[in-house]
């Protein structure tokens, strides 16, 4: 039986990845020209319209529903003359993220073909390639988050802090990685001599030992980067920048294409007049379990064992418990799969891995079937069909999250990969 290992070496790995994305780009151009169902994501039209407003000397927020940093509209300014430019940027970001994954895996001691095999989970993933070539900007988030992990892994903490500040400015959610990285940055990992804590050390001493110069520098530099970007954007675009880039996402009530268990509740809330809305709304407190898991409990439990697994679990928890959950959000945690899977239960136990994948796909398909009847056939499936499908998908994700956390908790700080691609 021929080996696939030659295709997993760096040059063929990225050649195939590039051809996949180019093929999808050309297919998308054909489908947009010949089909009523367009390949290009509606968000891409929002991005390019915003760039057109910027090119005309106006605010990107002159475009209704533009809810992003002006940086994105600036990056996509060439789309005014070359409409496909943004898709090329997003596809290139996918490839760069894959290269960073490969670098991190190689640094862990994997041979080239094995590291390429796991990197292919991102680089050859049709879902990843399709989302970026349709014009979704999630590929940029992928390269930023993987760049953050790569920089920390290489002990380039100043660069990591700048990337973190930029990432949070770009999409808010990467702030969840700050607690994990800061907790991970102990003397042992920084190559410094660890001092044995006296038995009678006070809380004051423990706090003083935690706030080391390296941790303070990392936190301050990331905060300064974030604030400088925000101050510049506020100076140019004033209040609309804050409202559309940040405040909108805090108060967002979006029930369309939303896998979240809060989906039906958000629909009912959106249909309720403001004067009749109850003072206490349960969806307003959705962030409590979400942030408790992703910013406190998971980092404390996993970060010092395996930072990549911690970031995977944090992101998975954040997406699962978010009150708005769309298919693009899945890419936020899929970027970490190649780093988590080598030592995971899903790979050690093939049946468990296949079962989890099938359960995740089937529960998602059940939701999509209900959503199709609602959106395209005009059948009201909000209750019980769509609600039950949302609950089922949520429970499946909670179970998968539990497995990921258990895997991370079992890891030693010196885990190594002991298999190779044949």
Swiss-Prot record:
Cellular component aspect of the GO annotation: endoplasmic reticulum membrane; glycosylphosphatidylinositol-mannosyltransferase I complex
A GO molecular function held by the record: alpha-1,4-mannosyltransferase activity
One protein family per Pfam: Mannosyl_trans
Membrane topology: Multi-pass membrane protein
UniProt-listed Enzyme Commission number(s): 2.4.1.-
GO biological processes: cell wall organization; GPI anchor biosynthetic process
Family: Belongs to the PIGM family.
UniProt protein name: GPI mannosyltransferase 1
Organism field: Gibberella zeae (strain ATCC MYA-4620 / CBS 123657 / FGSC 9075 / NRRL 31084 / PH-1)
UniProt lineage: Eukaryota, Fungi, Dikarya, Ascomycota, Pezizomycotina
GN (gene name): GPI14
